[in-house]
């Protein structure tokens, strides 16, 4: 956990942010989202998101560079690597929304990076650079032990709410869902659809931006362990969701495959059922990716048109994106 030393370092970070980051953050007028928001990371959506291009300083021993935020096979990837000829020895990625989000349920599906001395994160943040107090809610993976996740939050720059939760699995080995429901008098944290912790003191109140980053620490060895300089390292993200009215149907999106769908008319071909088993599920999604990567040149199903999910007469990445949105319940049907 962070100790008094960490708190002091983070306080100094707040001052640095107010000076260095202000021009970057103020590029967009503040907009608070009060409707459901779903982002599937098939590509860079510059209308909703920004790639950071600056440095925090303090405990963050890297510069954020847009080149370190990439998209591949339906994932957003943050890459920590060496930086040559700059003010920092390392470069990495940070991705964040242009808009602000308040009370509600937040969820991410991600795979953390594993290595001593680093942090993979999903969080909300606002601060002096937004003309706001420093309010923040964190889900953080300390790379030295990715069988645990750390929850924390700040209200007006005051933290000290760290809680380490034993996951029962290694977060760097596979994708899982993590979330939190933020309310005026509590924050509930979730792992794979199960509520695992509730915080009730010093709850933040100011809407913030949804953010993700990967970074190596410096001067915080007691917390993170001493970073050994290993590169490249990657944290991967599949989607982000926000529901202002709280946990949808009192149950966050679980990691296991969504129950297969069955056509109402069995005589009609089922859109998205590219393996021809009568259902649309993650097996079809995996097969579709293999097709687009040209690992296979034809789907097992007889009617190849079932792959034209968006019905535009072509079979391409837009169909895969639509299929993925259906599987994570971002859209009700195909």
Swiss-Prot record:
Q: Provide the Dockerin domain boundaries.
A: 267-334
Keywords for this protein: Glycosidase, Hydrolase, Signal
Carries keyword Signal? Answer: yes
Report the InterPro entries cross-referenced here: Beta-glucanase/XTH, Beta_glucanase, ConA-like_dom_sf, Dockerin_1_rpt, Dockerin_dom, Dockerin_dom_sf, EF_Hand_1_Ca_BS, GH16
Record text on subunit structure and interactions: May form part of a multienzyme complex (cellulosome).
Highest taxon, organism lineage = Bacteria
- GO function term, MF aspect, one: licheninase activity
Record gene name? licB
- Name the source organism: Acetivibrio thermocellus (strain ATCC 27405 / DSM 1237 / JCM 9322 / NBRC 103400 / NCIMB 10682 / NRRL B-4536 / VPI 7372) (Clostridium thermocellum)
The protein depicted here goes by the name Beta-glucanase
Query: Into which family does the record put it?
Result: Belongs to the glycosyl hydrolase 16 family.
Q: NCBIfam families recorded for this chain?
A: BGlucanaseBglS
Domain GH16, which positions? 28-248
The organism that produces this protein has a lineage beginning with: Bacteria, Bacillati, Bacillota, Clostridia, Eubacteriales
- Catalysed reaction per UniProt? Hydrolysis of (1->4)-beta-D-glucosidic linkages in beta-D-glucans containing (1->3)- and (1->4)-bonds
Q: What is its EC number?
A: 3.2.1.73
The active site consists of 136 (nucleophile), 140 (proton donor)
- Which SUPFAM superfamilies does the record cross-reference, listed alphabetically? Concanavalin A-like lectins/glucanases (SSF49899), Type I dockerin domain (SSF63446)
> Please, one GO biological process term?
polysaccharide catabolic process
Q: Which Pfam families does the entry mention?
A: Dockerin_1 (PF00404), Glyco_hydro_16 (PF00722)
Q: Where is the signal peptide?
A: 1-27
């Amino acid at each position: 956990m962070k100790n008094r030393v960490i708190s002091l370092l983070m306080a100094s970070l707040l001052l640095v942010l107010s000076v260095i980051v202000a021009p970057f953050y103020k590029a967009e007028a503040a907009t608070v989202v009060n409707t459901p928001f779903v982002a599937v990371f098939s590509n860079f959506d510059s209308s909703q998101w920004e790639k950071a291009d600056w440095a925090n300083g303090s405990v963050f021993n890297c510069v954020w560079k847009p080149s370190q935020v990439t998209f591949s096979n339906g994932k957003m990837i943050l890459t920590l690597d060496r930086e040559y000829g700059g003010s920092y020895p390392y470069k990495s990625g940070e991705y964040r929304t242009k808009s602000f989000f308040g009370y509600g349920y937040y969820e991410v599906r991600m795979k953390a990076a594993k290595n001593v001395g680093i942090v993979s994160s999903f969080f909300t943040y606002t601060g002096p650079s937004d003309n706001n107090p420093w309010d923040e809610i964190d889900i953080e993976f300390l790379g030295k032990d990715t069988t645990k996740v750390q929850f924390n939050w700040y209200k007006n720059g005051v933290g000290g709410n760290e809680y380490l939760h034993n996951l029962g699995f290694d977060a760097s080995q596979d994708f899982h869902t993590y979330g939190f429901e933020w309310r005026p008098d509590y924050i509930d944290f979730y792992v794979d659809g199960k509520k695992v912790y509730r915080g009730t003191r010093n709850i933040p109140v100011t809407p913030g931006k949804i953010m993700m980053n990967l970074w190596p620490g410096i001067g915080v060895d007691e917390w993170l362990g001493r970073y050994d300089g290993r590169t490249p390292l990657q944290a991967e993200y599949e989607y982000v969701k926000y529901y202002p009215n709280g946990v949808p149907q009192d149950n966050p999106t679980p990691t296991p495959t969504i129950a297969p769908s069955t056509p109402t008319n069995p005589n009609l071909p089922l859109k998205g059922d590219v393996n021809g088993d009568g259902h649309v599920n993650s097996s079809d999604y995996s097969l579709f990716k293999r097709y687009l990567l040209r690992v296979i040149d034809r789907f097992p199903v007889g009617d190849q048109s079932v792959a034209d999910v968006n019905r535009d007469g072509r079979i391409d990445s837009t169909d895969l994106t639509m299929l993925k949105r259906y599987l994570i319940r971002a859209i009700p049907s195909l």
